[in-house]
Amino acid sequence: MNNLIDISTLHVDFQLEKSIVPAINGIDLSIKKEKTLGIVGESGCGKSVLALSIMGLIPPPGKVTNGKIILKQDNTEIDLTKIDSNSQLMRNIRGNKMSMIFQEPMTSLNPVFNIGEQIIETIRLHQKVNYSVSKQRTIQILKEVGFPDPESRIFDYPHQLSGGMLQRVMIAMALVCNPLLLIADEPTTALDVTIQAQVLKLMNKIKLGYKPTIIFITHDLGVIAKMADEVAIMYVGKIVEHASVNEIFSNPKHPYTIGLIQSMPTLNRQRNKPLITIKGNVPNPGEIKTGCNFYPRCPKVMSKCKKEEPLLLNLSKNQKVSCFLYN
């Protein structure tokens, strides 16, 4: 199957006054057209930095120091790492060919402008249409994402809307130019449980209707089970396992993946029985100087794990893992 995005040996570093922090440390990843890739990991594992790298939105002092991010379209290939993030070419791609839904809708919209103006601006930046056509398209897309009475409420300002409605506006803005790639960075994190369910239902509707390639970032494996075709498990700037969603849940290999699945609460667990947890905490990027980043927390650690770094190798057609238990 054709890939839309090919990432190879990607490194993203943050240059601090006294040190360099490696946020992404040599990622190789292919994202198939019209499929949903779930990216899972604890906070601090580099999920959002990876997404921002693709979008060309890494904030200073961060920068891509090595590797390629290839966007494939119409028999052409564009290395996004070679394009200035503020250039006209990148502005034409971002918001048009690639869009992103951020995890904090309340801080992602401009409070000075009403929601209609902000979506209309997105359309007119990327498409040669007048204000009237842009307004009608804005009303249409808001209807599609379940925003009530958009004809009159497009004049509402962000502070007048609930978190769920704001996230629908963000989804509408991301979809309005029909992008090839849609990145959803924990789009349900700031919402309550019932609104989360509504947003996930909407995202599945988008998958079927618009058929974009989706990168869905979350720390919730339950969400991934509903949304994803493939899953990449990230830990401290690296992918430690990459497999189909069925393989991840039925046959997880990496001890970190197994730990994440075991720590999921279930309805049929015994009362008063403690939840299973992964011991320890995620180390800071670059803190583990040699060996596997997971060895201080791993229940199956071996002496080799402390000295050498395992490669991400194919176990089968649908599964890769980075662990000395298998290579």
Where are these regions (language model features)?
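Conserved ABC ATPase signature
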Residues: 156-161, 165
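P-loop NTP-binding/switch modules centered on Walker-like glycine-rich loops
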Residues: 183-187, 191-273
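ABC ATPase NBD coupling module
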Residues: 76-99, 125, 247-252, 284-289
